[in-house]
Amino acid sequence: MKVAVGTVNPVKVNAVKNVFGKLFDNVEVEGRKVGSGVPDQPFGSETIKGAINRAKNAYRTGDYDYGVGIEAGLTDVEGYVLDIQFCAVFDGLDCTTGCGSGFQYPPTVLAEVLTGREVGDVMSELTGIENLGQKMGAIGYLSRGMLDRTQLTEQSVLMAMIPRLNPKLYRQID
């Protein structure tokens, strides 16, 4: 089985390798640089749209069984702004989606992001950790290492696979 991930971020590619490797035998996972079609710092429904676009664009870069797109963004839920990571899995016909746990950023970080800056840049400045998003991620720093970005990404990938793991409960997805 060949899987294309719509990013070259090693954290996201490794998360897909980890989940698909537990679900299937003989899996090849490759990161592909593709566009998301949404702003670099997505808000609301832009986040899931970005994941879907990345999955479809990754799938189309070669001869793959699946394209996987992962996009993190901010979503307002009843006045609480949460960082939520979405995943989409595309097989050429059907797209399934899921998301991981959501969490809040410190007010100072959110204020900077609302002026147009990207969360990753603000968090790297705040922590002094260069390329934080390609390492433990903001979640790793904020949770004091109890959950890192790979684990958070794995959640969203597994959630997007649920309909594929249970085709009789959903519609038939092969």
Curated annotation (Swiss-Prot):
InterPro entries: ITPase-like_fam (IPR029001), Non_canon_purine_NTPase (IPR002786), NTPase/PRRC1 (IPR026533), YjjX_NTPase (IPR050299). It holds the Pfam family NTPase_I-T. Keywords: Hydrolase, Magnesium, Manganese, Metal-binding, Nucleotide metabolism, Nucleotide-binding. GO terms for biological process: nucleotide metabolic process; thiamine metabolic process. Its EC number is 3.6.1.73. Belongs to the YjjX NTPase family. This is Probable inosine/xanthosine triphosphatase. The lineage of its organism: Archaea, Methanobacteriati, Methanobacteriota, Stenosarchaea group, Methanomicrobia.
